């Protein structure tokens, strides 16, 4: 570029500025949530009860929900450099193909994770924490996992194609809307209001970031491929998983080894049903394409 320092500054300030501002806004949110929740729980324990409920969500449920995203990071490591390279070289069609693959694979992975937590979240929380509240949070937020995971992947892709200013803008608006939602909903509805804030926040950021990425890259939307097919596989897996959960109910009431066995059998069976349903719907095609592009021994371009 003609002015590399200016170009570097245009990249750095939205990214680093976004992190600093997001950190400040998240701190404000974390301070407001217990205070607003204490208003709702004024006659049921006040601030101590508010901190307990908020701690269950933040310290128990959310770490479990975000754990599978670490596995999805492998996909990011494979695709993000290629997305950035295609953008820099002006390879428009290749960029569209890579974005489509990223969105499609993320949809399948996040749908599977959502099904697992929706079906097995309560038994898992009971096994790990002996907490019914944590299980309720896992079950409630599980359907939003595709939005949460897509949001994170799309945010990285936007920065890879030079749209970090837009990502920064949407992040700021999201934080402001979250704070407004906390102040408006928590004093009236308690933790259910905060769960609604999380769900609406995920919907807004996912829609805003994905829409901007598709528009800026010229990629045609294919929501039936990205969300429709994964949702169909998820419904079939959820139906099988719920039936199996009823059959294994005695195992979850037994000693720890039997609980672990029941959870392992149920999780593996649910995963198997999902993969069997998703493979002919497009997962097999994308997995084969990803393997062909990154198989060991493949000559690099």
Model regions and ranges:
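Hydrophobic alpha-helical transmembrane segments in multi-pass integral membrane proteins
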Residues: 182-183, 235-251
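Alpha-helical transmembrane segments of polytopic membrane transporters and translocases
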Residues: 14, 49-72, 104-105
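Short runs within selected transmembrane alpha-helices of multi-pass transporters and secretion channels
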Residues: 136-162, 166-186, 191-213, 270
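Helix-loop junctions and terminal segments of transmembrane helices
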Residues: 66-90, 96
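Membrane-proximal transmembrane or re-entrant/amphipathic helices at the cytosolic face
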Residues: 244-301
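Interfacial segments at transmembrane-helix termini and the short loops linking adjacent helices
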Residues: 118-148, 152, 253-257
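Short alpha-helical transmembrane segments in multi-pass integral membrane proteins
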Residues: 1-4, 8, 98-118, 124, ...
């Amino acid at each position: 570029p003609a002015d590399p320092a200016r170009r570097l500054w245009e990249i750095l300030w939205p990214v680093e500025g976004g992190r600093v501002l997001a950190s400040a806004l998240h701190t404000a949110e974390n301070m407001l949530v217990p205070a607003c929740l204490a208003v709702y729980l004024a006659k049921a324990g006040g601030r101590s009860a508010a901190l307990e409920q908020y701690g269950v969500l933040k310290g128990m449920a959310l770490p479990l929900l975000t754990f599978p995203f670490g596995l999805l990071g492998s996909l990011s490591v494979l695709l993000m450099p290629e997305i950035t390279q295609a953008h820099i070289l002006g390879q428009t069609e290749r960029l569209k193909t890579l974005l489509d693959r990223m969105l499609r694979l993320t949809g399948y992975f996040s749908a599977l994770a959502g099904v697992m937590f929706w079906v097995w979240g309560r038994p898992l929380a009971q096994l790990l924490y002996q907490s019914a509240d944590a299980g309720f949070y896992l079950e409630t937020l599980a359907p939003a996992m595709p939005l949460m995971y897509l949001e994170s992947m799309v945010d990285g892709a936007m920065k890879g194609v030079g749209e970090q200013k837009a990502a920064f803008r949407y992040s700021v608006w999201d934080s402001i809307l979250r704070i407004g939602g906390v102040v408006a909903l928590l004093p009236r509805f308690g933790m259910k209001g905060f769960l609604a804030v999380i769900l609406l926040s995920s919907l807004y950021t996912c829609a805003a970031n994905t829409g901007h990425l598709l528009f800026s890259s010229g990629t045609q939307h294919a929501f039936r491929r990205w969300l429709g097919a994964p949702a169909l596989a998820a419904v079939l897996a959820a139906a099988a998983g719920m039936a199996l959960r009823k059959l294994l109910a005695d195992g979850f009431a037994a000693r720890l080894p039997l609980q672990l066995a029941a959870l392992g059998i149920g999780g593996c069976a649910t995963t198997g049903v999902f993969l069997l349903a998703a493979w002919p719907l497009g997962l097999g095609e994308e997995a084969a394409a990803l393997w062909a592009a990154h198989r060991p021994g493949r000559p690099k371009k």
